Amino acid sequence: PFFIARRYLFSKKKHNAINIISGISVCGVALATLALVCTLSVFNGFQDMVAGFFTAFDPELKITVREGKVFDPHEACIRQVHALSEIDVWTETLEENAMVQYKDRQAMAVIKGVEDNFEQLTSIDSLLYGTGKFLLSDSVVDYGFLGVELISELGTGIQFVDPLQVYAPKRNVRVNIANPTAAFNREYLFSPGAIFAVNQQKYDSRYILTSLDFARRLFNYDTEVSAIEMKLKPGSNIGSVQKKIAGILGDRFIVQNRYEQQADVFRIMEIEKLISYLFLTFILGIACFNVIGSLSMLILDKREDVET
């Protein structure tokens, strides 16, 4: 077969147009296949890169309540989960929207209060830029780590001198038209000398990391939390531990891994990959039909040789 293929590939043909069409068809199939492989490889690499960004900020497992915003972390079922041997780091967090003001600039932000062991839970140190260290508070003031896009919107810079004012509505308090400011809590955050950059707009443009005590004081909570974030011991199977925790907590709580915490982002990426795959497969199919047509013309051209 190789001898026959080489003979007809390099031999002189009667119809030069057939040779040109055949060459174009073969090149079309090769280029379409190359484009399909390269595109899918790029999407897979891009997905891994995005997952790496979230890995540095999101926990391995996260517990949230299915209905409502907050829950009591001292419930019996929560304590039972906390006692699991597979859990290495356990952190309580509280997230809520607030308005922040620096001088004459204002912006809406998400205040995320975390415990001091948050840097053990995630690779937050690798996301910090500036001269400061990861310090949430001291005996005098509370510190706030702002996202890189949020500091640009507020104009604070990495090391801001004036305190950042944070406003949040008081719970179960009606607004007094004569004095509307009385319906809001106001607290102050100071610069720790560092900011964070996750390279994801969701976090960089809205989030402020601070202490859990500050968040509870601002939003009028005592011991409630909005989530419990966990890091497992090395060698633990995340899927099996996730199922075990979900079985203990029941339907009232949601247990998510890193991919489920960012389900919308990865779903969009999968849709983009599918669309690209279908589009390039369609082009490859057209190129294959061209090859079939070229082979048909080549068979007609070589009918005399076949008969002999």
Where are these regions (language model features)?
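A structural signal for hydrophobic secondary-structure junctions
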Residues: 79-209, 213-219
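Membrane-interface junction motifs in transport/secretion proteins
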Residues: 47-77
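N-terminal Sec/SRP start-transfer signal
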Residues: 1-33
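Short amphipathic alpha-helices in soluble, non-transmembrane regions
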Residues: 75-82, 125, 241-249
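Alpha-helical transmembrane segments
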Residues: 9, 20-21, 31-59, 296
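Conserved phosphate/oxyanion-binding catalytic-loop motifs
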Residues: 306
